């Protein structure tokens, strides 16, 4: 090999290689492959620089014949091949005159045209693996990397190859020739196998033994060991690589990766149309409770008994009448349904023993409200095979709705504190192991912050209603059962309270599949006058049913009491998830925990106590048109909980789609904020995917509006 090197390379290059090996204490008689590699690398560096000049106008030109009259400056400063002291002197001088950032490792060249240092690599392995080892070693955005291989492949930072095609072809041809010459002498295999990876000086967390073997076994194809894969991942430069791969896949695919800049994203377009309406399964901020404190009546805990007891606390009932009709419904039927509930409750009270459940008489108004006999007749598919024009019935496209202010008000209310405690300390699961002392502490702090939150009331209300409805749907399939909407809580003083929000009457419920629908009519008490925001109550018929005396600063005032009535429906799978709404507590607790973990890892100690007890510190809660909203840690807990609860209450395909698609845009924006220079292709397609989810759902529209606020402030 030594003889081949002396024959094959220019004597000046051989001499420089000898000096370099001597400087590093290596014997070229033994390390002959290393000797050949150094010579090859030097030659590539010189060829890279050859014939490239900068003229008087500062333009880069190629001059192959020496013209003594031309006032030309070499485009590249060659650093490789100088002894270390001299090389660093050159680097320092370049940094001082050009303002370039000083590299940690000695680079090979400096490009006066592009004003950057260049690291040249020549590899006998795959270019991308070697590229990534180089990138991982030098860890500098400023140094440009250009790798050549003996097979004619190359790879460069951001697919920017610096030189023209012809100059690079000269280098590739020379490398190919060296390879053939070596092969003809039987030297190539030994040379190819002798290449070691770039040695970095930093310490690495070593994996040994079984874990190491498992790691090596589970690598993607084409990676021989974990180190190669690590290097590949650490320095992967995706943009040019993805473009190349896509164009190989198909001629039709043309993914031009565009840089994503602060000016690139536009706001998400929200739909126009009438304002969106309330679509939750039960009233939220508008609900009114009839309550009993310290219940101790006979049959306490039996829903029907509790409901009757709560109804007796109110004395302001009056002859009901419709104050806001439902545009598409038969409003007298809603009125008759409420009157029937009152009458049948009265009947129960007149009985000697109150029954545990109450099935309503199947009157015409309830049959209409519950859609009895309205479903089209089901026909077996086999009986229809011969019908030539069999088709699914046409359904209308949903009408586009615009964002309305009521949904933001609902969310704000859900974050507020009530005057009752809705969960006990042990509501969020028990400790499983002694290690969880910190977990217990976090859970207790978190519970204290959210136990009085209105979102927590919604959880308990949702769990109760869904459990009761699913039980009744299975136990009384054919009956129109009356189900009280009840919740339980404690006052701040610790007294127990039972609350009645209204009633549900369920329809026939032969639920075979998870998605089979059970219809129900909900009747809920409220003090909200529906005429203030009629668009919110589009799906409701609202009755005035009584007058309530309320204590106020000026004494007692009488307010009309309303009943919000609507037909609704749900399914087994929706009720199953509704019963598990307590998961929202866990989800938001985990989000808070990750904030504490981040803080703890910075301070290198557990910060749970400080996190919850330092009342003066504020944390980011969310975006609004005013900017980033901040609040106490308790407010953060309650806001995260409210978001999780609303995701459950307003769950829909629109929300699923919006969350998945907008997340992609969010990640790109965050990458831009972190100065990672993200690139995108088909950004228009992503916007389309996001915007096709914005139809009429109030919670999705609100999230889209928040996202726009985030975009505005994130890209300032």
Swiss-Prot record:
The keyword Chaperone does not apply. Binds 2 manganese ions per subunit. Keywords: Cap snatching, Endonuclease, Eukaryotic host gene expression shutoff by virus, Eukaryotic host transcription shutoff by virus, Host cytoplasm, Host gene expression shutoff by virus, Host nucleus, Host-virus interaction, Hydrolase, Inhibition of host RNA polymerase II by virus, Manganese, Metal-binding, Nuclease, Phosphoprotein. Its cofactor is Mn(2+). A motif (Nuclear localization signal 1 (NLS1)) lies at residues 124-139. A motif (Nuclear localization signal 2 (NLS2)) lies at residues 184-247. Belongs to the influenza viruses PA family. Plays an essential role in viral RNA transcription and replication by forming the heterotrimeric polymerase complex together with PB1 and PB2 subunits. The complex transcribes viral mRNAs by using a unique mechanism called cap-snatching. It consists in the hijacking and cleavage of host capped pre-mRNAs. These short capped RNAs are then used as primers for viral mRNAs. The PB2 subunit is responsible for the binding of the 5' cap of cellular pre-mRNAs which are subsequently cleaved after 10-13 nucleotides by the PA subunit that carries the endonuclease activity. Influenza RNA polymerase is composed of three subunits: PB1, PB2 and PA. Interacts (via C-terminus) with PB1 (via N-terminus). GO terms for biological process: cap snatching; DNA-templated transcription; symbiont-mediated suppression of host gene expression; symbiont-mediated suppression of host mRNA transcription via inhibition of RNA polymerase II activity; viral RNA genome replication; viral translational frameshifting. InterPro entries: INFV_PA, PA/PA-X, PA/PA-X_sf. The lineage of its organism: Viruses, Riboviria, Orthornavirae, Negarnaviricota, Polyploviricotina. GO terms for molecular function: endonuclease activity; metal ion binding; RNA binding. This is Polymerase acidic protein. Mn(2+) 1 binds at residues 41, 108, 119-120. Transmembrane segments: none annotated. Its main location: host cell.
């Amino acid at each position: 090999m030594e003889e081949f090197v002396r024959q094959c390379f220019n004597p000046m290059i051989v001499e420089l290689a000898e000096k370099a090996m001597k400087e590093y204490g290596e014997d070229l008689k033994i390390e002959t492959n290393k000797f050949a590699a150094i010579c090859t690398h030097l030659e590539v560096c010189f060829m890279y620089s050859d014939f490239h000049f900068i003229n008087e106008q500062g333009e880069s030109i190629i001059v192959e014949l020496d013209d003594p009259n031309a006032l030309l400056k070499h485009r590249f400063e060659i650093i490789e091949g100088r002894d270390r002291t001299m090389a660093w002197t050159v680097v320092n001088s370049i940094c001082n005159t050009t303002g370039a950032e000083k590299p940690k490792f000695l680079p090979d060249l400096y490009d006066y045209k592009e004003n950057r240092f260049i690291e040249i690599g020549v590899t006998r392995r795959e270019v991308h693996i070697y590229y990534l080892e180089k990138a991982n070693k030098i860890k500098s955005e400023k140094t440009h990397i250009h790798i050549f291989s003996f097979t004619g492949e190359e790879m460069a930072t951001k697919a920017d190859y610096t030189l023209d095609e012809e100059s690079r072809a000269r280098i590739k041809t020379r490398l190919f020739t060296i390879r053939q010459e070596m092969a003809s002498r039987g030297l190539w295999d030994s040379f190819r196998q002798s290449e070691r990876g770039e040695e970095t000086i930093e310490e690495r967390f070593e994996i040994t033994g079984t874990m190491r073997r498992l790691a090596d076994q589970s690598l993607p194809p084409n990676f021989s060991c974990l180190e190669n894969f690590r290097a590949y991942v650490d320095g992967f430069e995706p943009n040019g690589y993805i473009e190349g791969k896509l164009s190989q896949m198909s001629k039709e695919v043309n993914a031009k990766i565009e840089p994503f800049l602060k000016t690139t994203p536009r706001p998400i377009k929200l739909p126009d149309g009438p304002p969106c309406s309330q679509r939750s399964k039960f009233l939220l901020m508008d609900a009114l409770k009839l309550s009993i404190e310290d219940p101790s009546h006979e049959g306490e805990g039996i829903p029907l008994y509790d409901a009757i007891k709560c109804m007796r606390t109110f004395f302001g009932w009056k002859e009901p009448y419709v104050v806001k009709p439902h545009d598409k419904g038969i409003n007298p039927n809603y009125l008759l349904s409420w009157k029937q509930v009152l009458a049948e409750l009265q009947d129960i009270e007149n009985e000697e023993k109150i029954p545990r459940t109450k099935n309503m008489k199947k009157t015409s108004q309830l049959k209409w409200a519950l859609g009895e006999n309205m479903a089209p007749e089901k026909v077996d598919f086999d009986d229809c095979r011969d019908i030539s024009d069999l088709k699914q019935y046409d359904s209308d496209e949903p009408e586009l709705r615009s964002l309305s202010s009521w949904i933001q008000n609902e969310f704000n209310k859900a974050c507020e504190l009530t005057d009752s405690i809705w969960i006990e300390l042990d509501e969020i699961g028990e400790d499983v192991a002694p290690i969880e002392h910190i977990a217990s502490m976090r859970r207790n702090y978190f519970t204290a912050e959210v136990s009085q939150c209105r979102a927590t009331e919604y959880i308990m209300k949702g769990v109760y209603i869904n459990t009761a409805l699913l039980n009744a749907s299975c136990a009384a399939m054919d009956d129109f059962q009356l189900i009280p909407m009840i919740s339980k809580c404690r006052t701040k003083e610790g007294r127990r309270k039972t609350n009645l929000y209204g009633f549900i009457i369920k329809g026939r419920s032969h639920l075979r599949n998870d998605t089979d629908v059970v219809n129900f009519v909900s009747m809920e008490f409220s003090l909200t006058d529906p005429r203030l925001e009629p668009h919110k109550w589009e799906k409701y018929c609202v009755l005035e049913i009584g007058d309530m005396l309320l204590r106020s600063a000026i004494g007692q005032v009488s307010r009309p009491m309303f009943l919000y009535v609507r037909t609704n429906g749900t399914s087994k799978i929706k009720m199953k998830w509704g019963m598990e709404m307590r998961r929202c507590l866990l989800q938001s607790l985990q989000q808070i925990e990750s904030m504490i973990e981040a803080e703890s890892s910075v301070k290198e100690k557990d910060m749970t106590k400080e996190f919850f007890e330092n009342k003066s510190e504020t944390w980011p809660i969310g975006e609004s048109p005013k900017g980033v909203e901040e609040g106490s840690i308790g407010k953060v807990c309650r806001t995260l909980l409210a978001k999780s609860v609303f995701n459950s209450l307003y769950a829909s395909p629109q929300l699923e789609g919006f969350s998945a698609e907008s997340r992609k845009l969010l990640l790109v924006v965050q990458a831009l904020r972190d100065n990672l220079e993200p690139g995108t292709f088909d950004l228009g397609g992503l916007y389309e995917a996001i915007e096709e989810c914005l139809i009429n759902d109030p919670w999705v529209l609100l999230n889209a509006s928040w996202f726009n606020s985030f975009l505005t402030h994130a890209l300032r």
